[in-house]
């Protein structure tokens, strides 16, 4: 048994192994040195305690970097209760370190779907009763949806939601359009210092790492198909290209497709003439029969469907770095094909039928992380320096919404404030400046004459909201 001690009498947590806390703490200390923006905000605002009185329910990947985020929120005055937004993404040593610090956390790597939902419930409840939470920090929207559907009374005290991902933002906007969203939300995903860092540069770093850890394959000289060319797709295509892969891209958006062409990628379709007829006859079998690796990056459903999976080259690697496991039709694979676990989060999917299989069969696909996020299932996700920008945005977004005190507004004012919006650009620039300083960079200041000439202040913001970085 470990010598690790939690605060006396503290048992408000469930992790895989509390004895991993010392290891986790060592990694947290290293991560802090690689997160200058987040730590800069901690130093800047700690005396002010801008989150004093905030009670935050958090549901985001329980990694080492998230531990730094959690402890920053606490340092600024908040109370938190935490779970992971993915059954495979928790780093158990990180969860243990947070529990050992006396912070309620419910997360471990390899949760079942039922355990995943149970963990979220434990953050919503305290001592079996709904916690008097007033803020939500979410990744993907599951926590937000559960609160709206099962605990609507809690929303009367909640000032708002800060959402990390494209998928979660889509769900928020859908709820807003249908009149179902009851609290305002900050779209952290579309802050420049999140979308460009996390979605693009983070995936560039972590996709190839995860594939190599999962398969031990040499990637160079092989053919890859990247589904989607948004920021995640751009980073993913670069990640595979720098490994020496021959990368093709498929897109539905002509602007993103044009960008892929300009970046030197061949834009193709897995469907004849680009039209998904829903039949095997409509599949571009010549293309898919040559693909060694396929990765989904879209946040959309069934972008790698059953007919595509049937047509893929034998022994092709299939993975997802978008968000949920429904980007790949894993439901079809579970129903019709046999699964053989090679090691945790690596399966051979035998296309010879369900039930028993011949271990020597060579007609299989290699599925990573069961179709969930490959970079967190098969590796440790984005590095600390990447997550620095994302999580600094989360802190500023939490402060921003908490100060607005939505739950205390009269009904008429609430109707005006019920929006899904991005952080003000000035705050985005604040995060970027701290990141540049962390790299040892020096930003040049405009002269008053230059600022007047382009119609901005010397302190910024420097670009209009519509500017595309």
Swiss-Prot record:
EC number: 3.13.2.1
Keywords: Cytoplasm, Hydrolase, NAD, One-carbon metabolism
Reaction catalyzed: S-adenosyl-L-homocysteine + H2O = L-homocysteine + adenosine
Metabolic or biological pathway: Amino-acid biosynthesis; L-homocysteine biosynthesis; L-homocysteine from S-adenosyl-L-homocysteine: step 1/1
Residues noted as binding substrate in the record, renumbered to the chain: 63, 139, 164, 194, 198
Cofactor comment text: Binds 1 NAD(+) per subunit.
SMART domains: AdoHcyase, AdoHcyase_NAD
GO terms under cellular component: cytosol
Keyword Hydrolase assigned: yes
Signal peptide: none
Required cofactor names: NAD(+)
Binding site for NAD(+): 165-167, 199, 228-233, 251, 300, 321-323, 375
InterPro entries for the chain: Adenosylhomocyst_ase-like_sf (IPR042172), Adenosylhomocysteinase-like (IPR000043), Ado_hCys_hydrolase_NAD-bd (IPR015878), NAD(P)-bd_dom_sf (IPR036291), S-Ado-L-homoCys_hydrolase_CS (IPR020082)
A Pfam family annotated for this UniProt entry: AdoHcyase_NAD
Root EC class: hydrolase
Entry's localization field: Cytoplasm
Annotated GO MF terms: adenosylhomocysteinase activity
GO BP terms in the entry: L-homocysteine biosynthetic process; one-carbon metabolic process; S-adenosylmethionine cycle
Stated role: May play a key role in the regulation of the intracellular concentration of adenosylhomocysteine.
HAMAP family, per the entry: AdoHcyase
Protein family according to the UniProt entry: Belongs to the adenosylhomocysteinase family.
Name of the protein described by the UniProt record: Adenosylhomocysteinase
Protein's organism: Pseudomonas entomophila (strain L48)
Gene that this polypeptide is encoded by: ahcY
């Amino acid at each position: 048994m470990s010598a690790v001690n939690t605060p006396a009498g503290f048992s408000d947590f469930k992790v895989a192994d509390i004895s991993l806390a010392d290891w986790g703490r060592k990694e947290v200390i290293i991560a802090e040195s690689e997160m200058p923006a987040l730590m800069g905000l901690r130093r800047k605002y700690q005396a002010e305690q801008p989150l004093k009185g905030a009670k935050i329910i958090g549901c985001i990947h329980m990694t080492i970097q998230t531990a730094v985020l959690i402890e920053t929120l606490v340092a600024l005055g908040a109370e938190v209760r935490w779970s992971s937004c993915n059954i495979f993404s928790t780093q158990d040593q990180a969860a243990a370190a947070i529990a050992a610090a006396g912070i309620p956390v419910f997360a471990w790597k390899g949760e079942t779907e039922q355990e995943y939902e149970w963990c979220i419930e434990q953050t919503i409840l305290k001592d079996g009763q709904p916690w008097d939470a007033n803020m939500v920090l979410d990744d993907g929207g599951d926590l937000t949806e559960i609160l709206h559907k099962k605990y609507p009374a809690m929303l009367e005290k909640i000032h708002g939601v800060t959402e990390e991902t494209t998928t979660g933002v889509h769900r928020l906007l859908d709820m807003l359009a249908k009149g179902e969203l009851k609290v305002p939300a900050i779209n952290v995903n579309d802050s420049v210092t999140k979308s460009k860092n996390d979605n693009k540069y983070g995936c560039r770093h972590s996709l190839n790492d995860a594939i190599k850890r999962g398969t031990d394959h040499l990637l160079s000289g092989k053919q890859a198909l990247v589904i989607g060319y948004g920021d995640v797709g751009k980073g993913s295509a670069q990640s595979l290209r720098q490994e020496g892969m021959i990368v093709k891209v498929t897109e539905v958006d002509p602007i993103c497709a044009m960008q892929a062409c300009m970046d030197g990628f061949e834009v193709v379709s897995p469907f004849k003439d680009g039209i998904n007829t829903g039949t095997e006859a409509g599949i571009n079998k010549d293309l898919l029969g040559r693909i060694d690796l396929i990765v989904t990056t879209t946040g959309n459903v069934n972008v790698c469907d059953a007919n595509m999976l049937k047509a893929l080259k034998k022994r092709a690697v299939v993975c997802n770095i978008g968000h949920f496991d429904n980007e790949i039709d894993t439901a079809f694979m579970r129903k019709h094909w046999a699964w053989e676990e090679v090691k945790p989060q690596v399966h051979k999917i035998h296309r010879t039928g369900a039930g028993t299989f011949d271990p020597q069969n060579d007609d299989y696909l290699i599925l990573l992380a069961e179709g969930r996020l490959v970079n967190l299932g098969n590796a440790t996700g984005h590095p600390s320096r990447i997550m620095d920008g994302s999580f600094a945005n989360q802190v500023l977004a939490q402060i921003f919404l908490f100060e607005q005190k939505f739950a205390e507004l009269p009904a008429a004012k609430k109707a005006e404030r019920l929006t899904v919006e991005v952080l003000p650009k000035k705050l985005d620039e604040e995060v970027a400046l701290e990141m540049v300083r962390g790299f040892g960079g020096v930003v040049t200041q405009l002269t008053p004459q230059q600022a007047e000439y382009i119609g901005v202040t010397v302190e910024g913001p420097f670009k209009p909201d519509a500017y595309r970085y």
